[in-house]
């Protein structure tokens, strides 16, 4: 297997991947996936040895995950600040041109390891932030593919030249409550908010009903998730007000919700939540931030600065990543929530390789999170993509993150 620049992929490149993730200076957001890894060594040119500090059930899933597992050449790994401009991979398409905020142009990788693929010789990704522009371009035949929201899909339902594709997506849209600061440090306040909101209304208004209610592990994620009919999601306004009064807030309180317009559905969900919170006396101001600033304030800086923030946990192939990564007190990605009852359950599940035991432990962990309510879980979404009818061979991905065109072609 060769890199796009012609050099050979070797075990040393895999070691460089690990060194980059393990380096504190990298501040890798997915370092928590590999907490059990002690060392990664190159045994020979094509063999890698991974040593663990302790048994780690999710290892294979973590290595297979889309995020955190991308290998790049060692030489390129040294240039951490400019990876976006010097993309080198081993995939079916090579990046030939990148015009920031405008487009990316790819050409066929003639040395791709799967013979006969890809089918097309070149491909251009246009950066089109506005959905109206994407819909119009699809209608006019200026583009062949676009990612859409439920609103955009509705506008294309009568277009005979375009097919709208749908599939469940492990995209868990949530509002995180900052459990490290008042008033959200009081469990009763968090429970009041959970009882005071209507998740079905948010699903309908934020994404036109394109999705499903969900627990801490996304609905549809093999057999790790709690069925929707078992979730404690029935709104109870009187009980919510009672809990607020017991916590010392009989008249409610003022708070803020941080969101980024990078994802319109996040803002939509926040607007609906804002309206719902008023029913129990909570007045929430929505603060919209540019995506980079949002990530800095609410994720990377310590302490994180937010009352409530809206985000999404994207696809992970193992429930460990929805539960341990965000909610174990010692995880590098912990979301300002600490629970001595939860930690040992997650540790046992992480150390086990018995699927049934892990399933039992993860169900316990999910029940604790549902009761403690450090996050308000709205829904797991839908992949909504549209293709012109001349596009053949395109298959949707459950991750919602892997857009694969190596088996796609255009029919005249």
Placement of each model-derived feature along the sequence:
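Periplasmic binding protein-like
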Residues: 6, 144-148, 275-327, 361-363
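Extracytoplasmic/peripheral linker and loop segments enriched in polar/acidic and small residues
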Residues: 280-295, 322-389, 412
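Ligand-site clamp/hinge motif
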Residues: 2, 111-156, 283
